From Swiss-Prot:
Protein family (similarity comment): Belongs to the class-I aminoacyl-tRNA synthetase family.
Top enzyme class: ligase
Protein name: Leucine--tRNA ligase
Motif ('HIGH' region): 42-52
Catalytic activity: tRNA(Leu) + L-leucine + ATP = L-leucyl-tRNA(Leu) + AMP + diphosphate
Keywords: Aminoacyl-tRNA synthetase, ATP-binding, Cytoplasm, Ligase, Nucleotide-binding, Protein biosynthesis
Keyword Nucleotide-binding among UniProt keywords: yes
Subcellular localization(s) per the UniProt record: Cytoplasm
Superkingdom of the source species: Bacteria
Length: 820
């Protein structure tokens, strides 16, 4: 053991030891309790950032802690390798995304290994490998067979210059981020997964997720968006057709003054053929983004279609408007407008001089100026004929029943959740295993022809879909009739890859089936760690896919992740680290200067995992100083501990002196609190406990046999507490101080109940019920000793001067009251 702390050397030695001994490679073992710890897999950008390091350090602390607790721990790592960022990087560098991606993976794998994470690298997966996406294609075919994968027209953001679909974040001020062209709303044929078939189960099973943050549960509940409402039929004034409207407020039905339909509604398109003004309006609507948030905040605009519908109760004629705020994807693309009781309808009605008809008044009877603002709360019905003077809740049921009995409507449970559109008009993604044949139509690729390989030598230009230009890919033969046919050139949304990867880690070497029985052993994941930004999309899709895999008989649980931790961001100068802000701190430079253990210790100590972490250079220095202090202390006690650790009776040492028992009690109290905090994932306070223990031990001397044994016990506790957080130094010191074996093979320390027993009590001394002093006595002291100690207390003696004692009352373990 060197006198000075040399992190680069000891970290290299520890990592070589773990690799040579395959320390973190695990096998299924039914005799042991399993623990599956997983951090969200990264996109291989080429460089780890501090957000990565924090996420993975938290996960590693949890995994290593569970190893110490004797569990069979799986902690894997892989790469979310498909997607737009890689394609864009390839366009800029004029090279194939495959080359760029694999180079980055190699670099990032090395960086992760330098941090000493306890990953089972034998299970590494890369989502752009055909051995992975082959099974994703197989899964798509199973969904297609079950009717859960289907194709329909959908509205997208279309870049007319690059001839491609854009994500909302790729649009800047209404223009394509690369081409600068004005983005259009375009309807194209897209593949969807029928997540809506699982809406009710996805909502209900949120109640099972007892160890998820409430914020995430609420976000998912709102996203699924269950509501109880009524479907109402509005017949068109002319012809047999009708418009169906979904509403959660049938109590406002008598206040409808117009209907609004989406620009993409078939009726709007039909009217555009007969009106240039309507056609121009629809064209204008195409030049807006498709994101719901954007549509909600844009200026409300519309045009009269010239058509009328008939009110189902009053039989009044209602004008039908085409409005830019109505979403075709929501319900039926038709809204019943009640301007007096809906803010958006109110704004639109005032703009286009449409009538307001109040039908709800405040329940408390106070006046409301409906011209100034819509009254949106429940209340009492007015101007509603036979439903007048009824409260909104009662009216909901009465009007719903009336509509049903008269064939004009029906109750319906509605979900805000829409089917998952997985088509991407991009190159760098999983090919959708579908063939189009002029004779046979849409034909799924036979399973024995999987995988449909993505050509990896393409250099994308950013114009259109490269697969449409690659004849060797899209030209094929129909598997049914053997005539010339074409492949689907859309690729899958990368959220598909990340929706089932956690299960594939269980059996990445399996080439006969998607998942084998090992998946049932390891899933569900016991602890999942990732950012709150994935609360809805990724986590919801993974929950959906888990239920699909369960229904296919591949898994036997309902949910993918038992416990979820959403770690906070890493900030510097109060802002999230980013290259554009110039506030990035690179992990590599810190590891080189201080070592990986210092980086890990700072990240764990600086803040609780779920809170944001403010970067501090002085905090990093402080972590480094602590590890140097620990090293220096260990070097000083090395010879004494090596000698003690060779003794057979070292673990049965009895401390007799009160001061030694008190010191041992302090150490075990720190351990007790650390164990509580470890279970609560409050790792920063575990570090505080370790620092307290070291400060206690430093005051002791190895020249005293009792204190030397205290140092040995305390150091053994300290190193194991630190082992998940700073594994390299803990590994090295454990062996250098003669504790024997691998520290990871030793059980997690537990406080000795005897050590926690208090040896002395503090008792209150009263004279005639008034506090006059405090005394310390042994816990088992006799009544006589307690009385004698109390009567000899200095302040008590002063108050007893010239007084006659009538009696002394001793309340065991609490107080002494002297009556004078």
């Amino acid at each position: 053991m060197n006198e000075s702390y040399q992190p680069t050397l000891i970290e290299q030695l520890a990592q070589e030891y773990w690799e040579e001994n395959e320390t973190f490679e695990v096998k299924e073992d039914l005799s042991r309790e399993k623990f599956y710890c997983l951090s969200m897999l990264p996109y291989p950008s080429g460089d780890l950032h501090m957000g990565h390091v924090r996420n993975y350090t938290i996960g590693d602390v949890i995994a290593r802690y569970q190893i110490h607790k004797g569990r069979n721990v799986l902690q894997p790592m892989g790469w979310d390798a498909f997607g737009l960022p890689a394609e864009n990087a390839a366009i800029q560098r004029e090279l194939p995304p495959a080359e760029w991606t694999r180079k980055n993976i190699k670099k990032m794998r090395k960086q992760l290994k330098q941090l000493g994470f306890a990953y089972d690298w034998s299970r590494e997966i890369t989502t752009c490998d055909s051995t992975y996406y082959r099974w994703e294609q197989w899964l798509f075919l199973q969904l297609y067979k079950k009717g859960l994968a289907y194709k329909k027209n959908a509205i997208v953001n279309w870049d007319p210059v690059d001839q491609t679909v854009l994500a909302n974040e790729q649009i800047v001020d209404g223009r394509g981020w690369r081409s600068g062209a004005v983005v259009e709303r375009r309807e194209i044929s897209q593949w969807f997964l029928k997540i809506t078939d699982y809406s009710e189960e996805l909502l209900k099973d949120l109640d099972e997720l007892k160890e998820w943050p409430e914020q995430v549960i609420t976000m998912q509940r709102n996203w699924i968006g269950q509501s109880q409402g009524v479907i109402i039929n509005f017949n068109l004034e002319k012809g047999p057709d009708k418009l169906q409207v979904y509403t959660t407020r049938p109590d406002t039905l008598m206040g409808v003054t117009y209907l609004a339909i989406a620009p993409e509604h078939p009726l709007a398109k039909e009217r555009a053929k007969k009106s240039k003004k309507i056609a121009a309006f629809l064209k204008k609507c195409k030049q807006t983004r498709v994101a719901e948030a954007d549509i909600a905040t844009q200026e409300k605009e519309g045009i009269d279609s010239g058509l009328f519908a008939v009110h189902p109760l009053s039989k009044e004629k209602l004008p039908i408007w085409i409005a830019n705020f109505v979403l075709m994807e929501y319900a039926s693309g038709v809204v019943m407008a009640v301007p007096a009781h809906d803010e958006r309808d109110h704004e639109f009605a005032l703009k286009y001089d449409l009538p307001l008809k109040p039908v709800i008044e405040p329940a408390d009877g106070h006046d409301w100026d409906y011209n100034q603002a819509a009254y949106t709360n429940p209340g009492k019905l007015i101007n509603s004929g036979s439903f007048n003077d009824i409260d909104s809740k009662t009216a909901f049921n009465l009007i719903a029943d009336y509509l049903k009995n008269n064939g004009a409507g029906s109750r319906q449970t509605h979900y805000r959740l829409r089917d998952w559109g997985i088509s991407r008009q991009r190159y760098w993604g999983t090919p959708i295993p579908i063939i189009y044949c002029k004779t046979c139509g849409t034909v799924p690729v036979p399973e024995n022809q999987l995988p449909v390989l993505l050509p990896e030598d393409i250099i994308p230009t950013g114009h259109g879909s490269p697969l449409k230009e690659t004849a060797s890919f899209y030209k094929t033969r129909c598997p049914v009739c053997n005539k010339p046919a074409t492949r689907e050139t859309d690729t899958m949304d990368t959220f598909v890859e990340s929706s089932w990867y956690y299960a594939r880690y269980s059996c990445p070497d399996q080439d006969k089936v998607m998942l084998d029985d090992r998946a049932k052993y390891w899933t569900p994941v016991d602890q999942y760690i990732g950012g709150i930004e994935h609360a809805v999309m990724h986590l919801l899709y993974a929950r959906f896919m888990h239920k699909i895999l369960r229904d296919l008989g591949l898994l036997n649980s309902n949910e993918p992740f038992i416990r979820l931790l959403t770690q906070g961001m890493v900030l510097k100068d109060g802002a999230k680290m980013s290259k554009s802000k110039g506030n990035v701190v690179t992990p590599q430079s810190l590891i080189k200067k201080y070592g990986a253990d210092t980086v890990r210790l700072f990240i764990i100590f600086a803040a609780p995992p779920e809170q944001d972490l403010e970067w501090s250079d002085s905090g990093v220095e402080g972590a480094y100083r602590f590890l140097k202090k620990l090293w220096g202390f260990s070097y000083r006690i090395k010879d004494a501990l090596l000698a003690i650790n060779q003794q057979k009776e070292r673990s049965n040492y009895q401390w007799e002196a009160p001061e030694h028992r008190q010191t041992r009690q302090q150490i075990h109290e720190c351990l007790q609190q650390a164990n509580i905090d470890m279970e609560r994932l409050q790792f920063n306070t575990v570090v505080s406990a370790v620092m307290k223990i070291l400060n206690i031990l430093i005051k002791l001397t190895t020249d005293n046999d009792a204190e030397a044994h205290l140092i040995r016990e305390g150091t053994g506790i300290l190193l194991r507490l630190l082992s998940p957080i700073t594994p390299h130094i803990s590994h090295h010191l454990w062996q250098s101080l003669g504790f024997g074996g691998d520290i990871l093979d030793t059980p997690w320390p537990r406080p000795d109940p005897k050590a926690l027993q208090t040896t002395e009590l503090e008792l209150i001394v009263q004279i005639n019920g008034k506090l006059r002093g405090r005394i310390q006595v042994p816990t088992e002291a006799s009544k006589e000793i307690i009385e004698s100690t109390a009567l000899n207390q200095e302040n008590v003696q002063r108050h007893l001067a010239d007084k006659k004692i009538k009696k002394v009352i001793v309340v065991p373990k609490k107080l002494i009251n002297i009556v004078v």
